[in-house]
Amino acid sequence: MVELLVIIAVICILASLLLPAVAGSISRARQIACCGNINQIGRCVTLYSSDNQGCIPNIQPGMEQSSIPILRLPNGTFIALGRLLNSYTADVRIFGCPGSPGYEGDKIAENLLRTPMLWSAYLYRSCSSGFAERLADPANVDKALAADFACITASGEQFAPHDYMYSTILYSDCHTEIRRNSRTPFELYTVQAARHGELIPDCSSVWKNTDK
């Protein structure tokens, strides 16, 4: 009986040591996959710009200065990064983040078929906060083009990529960076929406913190 208790105690100790390592490995794998997805988005934007007089995908008239995580409007119109679908990528899953609950790649693919409005896990800057319309414009050097969409509403969490611990950021030259984030709205890369489903929360603080 004593020997059995000793064995159980040893197993418990080993489990307590291994579980954090396993959790860390899973988190790291999601982080790598997230970087891969947002990097693919950057490459698609580059291809799009080469076919469109150097311009990045626009949202729609009147929203040129907005940042948005929307791919498709309820009327079926693809906007912003959604304009990359079909012509520049056939895989809608790249718009999902494995570390953003409810907005993983497979969930985005599922929503493409069943929901009128299609959200991405990533916030697209468009021409807001001083980002020039032409991708290769010198003004865009060291400026971010997209990032994990981390958002908190008055009623609770809506978008919580990587548990608000860090954010994956895509820059105009297609390189990606992973930076520490905070769940406190507007402190780093997390924004706050007045209500669930608000399309255009104030995201200027995100780009202020991403740009170098």
Regions found by a protein language model. Give the residues of each.
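Short, well-structured segments within or immediately adjacent to enzyme catalytic domains
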Residues: 32-212
